[in-house]
């Protein structure tokens, strides 16, 4: 029998980075850029949920993760590092970290530690957000919810899209919802999982 544990974590990220961020553009060192991919970065005091959905993407082209966020400082500036507990299409061995600068309270610039990319982000109104992270055996569950937007992530560290393209039970779910303007119901906006599998 597995016990479901609600994880109470100390703050690891300054309050100024909390909230829902949307990416405006990424510019890569090779000169290519992307301003059309839908990206949602939900940041709580200690962990984050991130979903990226390219325009007209297939399932395997989406990327997402949920896990702990760590802030540190170097001579180059403040650093945020994202350490996924679960991810889609799978957990990578690569370090995910960047130098971050707030140009205004609602405008953030991120630069890769190796200079391989620059990203511009803007904060989206989402009211006061609540968050939870729990573990049931090897199953992680994350929820970050505001007054307008909500993100849910569920999966295992061993989940992988590759080799299981037709078996969504082996995929980590990361879903973004928006509250309908005329009701209190949450409407699914985007997910790593197909809608038919979620219901």
Model-found features: residue ranges?
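Catalytic phosphate/metal-binding cores of nucleic-acid and nucleotide-processing enzymes, i.e., regions
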Residues: 68
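Lipid interaction determinants
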Residues: 2-64, 74-199
């Amino acid at each position: 029998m597995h016990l479901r544990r609600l994880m109470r974590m100390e703050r690891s990220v300054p309050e100024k980075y909390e909230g829902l961020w949307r990416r405006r553009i990424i510019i890569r060192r090779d000169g290519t850029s992307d301003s059309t991919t839908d990206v949602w970065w939900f940041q709580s005091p200690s962990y984050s949920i991130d979903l990226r959905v390219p325009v007209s993407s297939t399932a395997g082209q989406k990327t997402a993760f949920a896990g702990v966020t760590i802030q540190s400082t170097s001579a180059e500036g403040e650093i945020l590092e994202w350490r996924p507990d679960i991810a889609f299409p799978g957990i990578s061995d690569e370090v995910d970290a960047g130098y971050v600068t707030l140009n205004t309270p609602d405008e953030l610039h991120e630069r890769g530690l190796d200079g391989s990319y620059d990203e511009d982000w803007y904060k989206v109104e989402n009211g006061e957000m609540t968050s939870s992270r729990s573990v049931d055996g090897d199953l992680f569950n994350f929820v970050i919810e505001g007054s307008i937007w909500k993100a849910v992530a569920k999966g295992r560290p061993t989940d992988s899209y590759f080799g299981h393209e037709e078996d969504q039970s082996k995929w980590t779910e990361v879903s973004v919802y928006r509250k309908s303007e005329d009701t209190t119901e949450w409407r699914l906006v985007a997910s790593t999982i197909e809608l038919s599998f979620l219901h």
